[in-house]
Amino acid sequence: MLPSVLPVHAGTRLTATLVNPVFIADLHLSPFKRRTARAFFDFMKTTAPLYRELFILGDLFEFWLGDDAAWIAGPVTKALAAYSASGRKLYLMQGNRDELLGADYAAATGAVLLAPQTPVVTAAGTRILLSHGDEWCTLDPDYQAFRTMMRDPAWRTMAPEKTF
């Protein structure tokens, strides 16, 4: 039997006992989706502050070519950093569009980068399985091979040398 609260990110013994969480996913922010971007900034200004913890469960961005490209998402980075600087907790999970989102971006926003393995957290006595969802595409072996490659630490160190 699993414990009721499990670690949510690699490398620490921290567990997530949630007080007042909100979960968002699949925003696919890009310069070409201005209405979605406006809705995100409105959410960050008016709604997110009502919650103690914000979980972004993947695909915050339409695409992410690496943490060295963080300048592309400057206003988003600032909004997330302001949220975490206010004393709230920000958690970030990679999706299938932003799987190269990494520790540098998490540090820039004050976020905890969630482990690639699907974590379980507890809120109000209820266990919640956190997942972007792409790992459940088990009938697509080509995608699963691509996903495994993109999340392989050895491959990621060579990623800037790769041609997409």
Name these PLM-found stretches:
Residues 8-9, 14-24, 29-123:
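Core catalytic region of metal-dependent phosphoesterases/phosphodiesterases
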Residues 24-29, 130-136:
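Histidine-centered catalytic micro-motifs
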Residues 114-120, 124-135, 141:
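Hydrophobic, well-structured mid-protein blocks that either form specific transmembrane helices
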Residues 131-164:
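Active-site-proximal loop/helix segment associated with metal-binding centers of metalloenzymes
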